[in-house]
Amino acid sequence: MGLLDSKLCMMILAVSVLIIDINFEARIGTFFDLRLRTSYFKKSSSPLLSHTDSEEDLNYLSKHEDKRPVAIVTGSYESAHTGHMMHIREMFEHTGYKIVTKNELSLDTKWDVMWHHEYSFTQEPFKTLIKNASPNQIVNHVPGSGFYTSKVQLATSDLSNGVPKAFQLPAEKSKLLEYAEKNPDVLWVQKDNTHRNIKIKSTNDMDLSKNNSFVQKFVDNPLLIDNKKFDIGIYTVVTSLLPLRVYIYDGDVLIRFCPEDYHPFDANNVDKYVVGDDYTPIWEINSLKKYFNTQKMSFKSTIDSYLGMQGMDTSKIWLQIRNIIGEVFRTQQTKMLMSLQNLKLNPQYFELSRFDFVVDDQLNVFLMEANMSPNLSSGHFKQNQILYEQVLMNIFSLTGISTPITKEADILFKSRTSEQNPLVNSRDINLPLKFCVENKCESCDEAPECQLCGHCMNTETRKILEQTFVENSNRKQMKRIQFDYENHHPLTKEDHLLTLWLSTKCQLDNTWC
């Protein structure tokens, strides 16, 4: 074979490789293929290919740019790649997001979801990014969440029940001393917002001048299992402040036991009565092993089964928990709305927290604290991973972080008129309310409730009902909290209208109840 024939064969072979490679990319279209494709160009010494290298690559890149939605996943004290944020990061990746960490973040970052461990409205660059955000973006904090996650605020919020009596210091020092003198048998613990160094003390041994702290009555008759005190963690999500919408994860709960036996009691040994980081997990409690380990029950079902066998009705516990959570948000709504008004937010917002409860031997429930950005790391107890992942999957669905359709389609459908949106149609939210059907709202000014009639509904009311409908469709195992509006009037007109609408929805379909 001559030299000319040899060069011709090499050119034909190179072109063949290019054609095969382009066809392969057309079928697959991944960034891995792009790297393969680029390597072919770089390795080729053929003059036939080299002059198109730059142009071809640029055209390919423009057509195959990374169009994944972007999630900012950050925590100030540790990397988002490990530890506390690991499962959160993984869940975003599982649902198709590109992750941006704090080191990669700038004011020019394009993003869809912001999940920051700390309160993001007061920290830069998060504060500016949120200020410039659009309604299609999602932030994992709500304005004013400190009014219920602050230990001091929560303990001294004067709830009607469910929180042990507490006195804020130093402002209520004299009231505390007066109460303690009249009730000498009461045990007390002093706490602050760090929730650290909790220990039973007499008022004489406390620093009653300490700012941002409080003294709280100790629940001295806790319900025990195998002589161990335990707490119950409820994962809670608020999705709206105006009107107020709050959900709890109803699929399971977190149960944690104290490291040491409660009796014989010793106030100097906090491991007997404080659930700390090194708690005893449920699968090590002898009386619960047959339910949790052998029968593979959930945390909640394990507790229900054991206490049920002891003749206890655990439905009382879960009802009290829902009522207490509802009262916390209802009583703090005014303060939170003031924060919302000051911030003037455009993006969607939600907040995950974990409410921790203890139960006494009479099945009375007491709220201990509400944790902002609760720990979802299974680094200490690997068995908790499935619970944390289920919580995240449910939250992602409820809040619209993950959807059954692409982000582009979601935005497209939402841009349509209400009559043309398959996600939530006007016929999904217009209900056969009696005052609408009986023509009592021919004039839309007859009563505020007339805004729920299809011909009277304004844009803002429609938006609220559409959001509520979509949440209910996507909530999976999240359960909406019912607020006590029988004994307390709804705070705002929006709350009143939503309550009336939800009541009618419940009558038509019990999945709304």
Swiss-Prot record:
- Give a yes or no for keyword Iron in this entry: no
Q: Which Pfam families does its entry note?
A: TTL
A molecular function annotated in GO for this UniProt entry is:
ligase activity
**Enzyme Commission code(s) on record:** 6.-.-.-
EC class, as a word, reads ligase
Q: Does the keyword ATP-binding apply?
A: yes
Record's family? Belongs to the tubulin--tyrosine ligase family.
Which PANTHER family does the record cross-reference, listed alphabetically?
Answer: LD09343P
> How is this protein named in the record?
Probable tubulin polyglutamylase ttll-15
What is the originating organism of this protein? Caenorhabditis elegans
Q: What's the name of its gene? A: ttll-15
